Amino acid sequence: MPGLPLTDHDAVNTGCEFDCQRSSDQMCCEHSVAQFSSDQQLNPEENLALYCKPLELYNFIRHRAIENPPYLQRCLLYKIRAKQKKRIQITISLPGSNNKELQAQNIFPLYVLFARPTSNVPIEGHSPIYRFSQARLLTSFNDSGNNDRAEATFVIPDLETLIATQAYGLTFILVSRGTKKNKGRTGQNLCENDCSEKHVDYSSLRKLAGKCFWGKIPITLLNSSLETCADLILGHIVESPISICMSPGYLEPTFLEHDNCLSFCSRKADAMVPYQLQVKVSAAEAGAKDILKSPYNSFSYSDVPPSLLLRIVRLRVGNVLFNYKNTQMSEVTEDFTCPFCLVRCGNFKGLECHMTSSHDLFHYEFWISEDYQAVNVTLKKDNMRTEFVAAEVDNSHRIFYYRSRFKKSRTEILPVARADAHIMESGSPEETQAESEDDVQEENENALIDDSKKLHGSNHSQSEFLAFGKSRKLSANRADPRNRLLLQKRQFIHSHKAQPMTFEEVLSDNDSEDEVDDDIADLEDRRMLDDFVDVTKDEKRIMHMWNSFIRKQSILADSHVPWACEAFSRHHGEELLENSALLWGWRMFMIKLWNHSLLSARTMDTCNRILDDIKNERSDPKKQ
């Protein structure tokens, strides 16, 4: 995060200086740090250190993505739309005021083709062979009041692509087949009614063959004018008058029959005189409407010198200001570039989509004014609080809290059947024994109470303590048998086994919720593998052996796979060697693990050596 210090700390909140409408949800991001207590308010240096923690993670992910990208950046929808909006829309029309001499002549219909030369080898008396991809038809002047077919519109690549590739000879070709027979013809395309503007039927192309007048507008001529024009970048329409020499020629019919190609021959043309045709070419970006809607593009360049206007406009278009809250730091990126991973996002909306989805450890406030495209970046409160606690408290001195499950006390209580009332006869030995036991118990209780009274200086009477003790004892003895009786009446089953539980298992402290029954798990695994149709019996068997092994050995992480393969080879080595198909299935499975980077070649070699050792031990009679 190469930050630039601001001259004023209030400049971090630059969004408040402009008349930019922002909702209350956006404004609350500016005061997110205010939710911390006074002892948690950090100085700018400490805040900057907290910002660097997530950035280290993002830098690590970015370096990993260089060699193994998670996805193609150019396939993102917002980048595709941004690229489409940067394409140039070219409109070609014929102004009647500049072609007064031609209005009396019949130059219509006039075909406009967007073509590219297929070969640069010149042939005497012939033009290069062109292959056209787009075709339009003009039937009138644009100021004649007849708007039907008065303009020909094309969409070409963006200006940067045209300049970088030098357009490879892209050309607009104008072909006039005007005759008295075709005078007044309107509403017809190049292919007439048989085909659309984008699709050309080969049979209809043959109608173009014959004598004609043709001229061309090289795309390089437009590049030279558009490259030095700042209005195109600002979303305005750029108009350029161009004079074209319409030369007589003969359109070869043989080329029209091969993949939308055409060539002109000057030898077969009659002694016709060429003429000059005045054409108006208008250029604008395809997304010009969206550009003009943005308040950032309504900035006035009246104070900028004309010599520096184009340079300043280009530098300003994709600049985004990032304000890092409470750090007194900010930075500016070009071409709508993310400051964390340096990904070009195409436009401001694409930058918003990228940062909110790829860098969610921060809060963002996106806003646009006449002077700035800005993003206020704030560290999330939860992350900041975690880092604050981790910085202040040493892990070795932190108190570790552990709360165990409530453990039932084991009390030896007579069964419910013995707790029933028992009637004794008066004067019987049983009654005498019971009375003597009660007297001994009462004497012990009185002795305990007297001792406690002496120790604590209590003045409470013995009857109060006796009443309290007897009430607790009676309630405990009365409640527990009832609970046991209720537990005995109901039938409980294991959650996984679906088997009935014994009464001792119900009263025990062991929880059967997380237990896994191996027999049931093996049965379910076999049922799942039986549903596979394109798998052999031995492959199903090796899959079942592996699934059962990793379940019993608790193989949970990818790092466990190497030693699990070695242990599997030792455990099932005898069984694998007895069945060659099973052995090859195990080796193919290890190759699949190697393809997924879960197993190294060294571990595969170790597993094969383990199997070889087991095989040698079986074949060696001395070791047996």
Swiss-Prot record:
The gene is EMF2A. Signal peptide: none annotated. Belongs to the VEFS (VRN2-EMF2-FIS2-SU(Z)12) family. GO terms for biological process: cell differentiation; chromatin organization. Widely expressed. Highly expressed in shoot apical meristem and inflorescence meristem. Expressed in roots, leaves and immature seeds. A zinc finger (C2H2-type) spans 338-359. PANTHER family: POLYCOMB GROUP PROTEIN, POLYCOMB PROTEIN SUZ12. Polycomb group (PcG) protein. PcG proteins act by forming multiprotein complexes, which are required to maintain the transcriptionally repressive state of homeotic genes throughout development. PcG proteins are not required to initiate repression, but to maintain it during later stages of development. They act via the methylation of histones, rendering chromatin heritably changed in its expressibility. It comes from the Eukaryota. Keywords: Chromatin regulator, Developmental protein, Differentiation, Metal-binding, Transcription, Transcription regulation, Zinc, Zinc-finger. Component of the polycomb repressive complex 2 (PRC2), which methylates 'Lys-27' residues of histone H3 (H3K27me3), leading to transcriptional repression of the affected target gene. This is Polycomb group protein EMF2A. Residues 420-445 are annotated as: Disordered. PROSITE patterns: ZINC_FINGER_C2H2_1. Residues 474-609 are annotated as: VEFS-box. One of its GO terms (cellular component) is nucleus. It comes from Oryza sativa subsp. japonica (Rice). InterPro entries: EMF2-like_DUF7651 (IPR056068), Polycomb_protein_VEFS-Box (IPR019135). Residues 432-445 have a biased composition (Acidic residues). One of its GO terms (molecular function) is chromatin DNA binding.
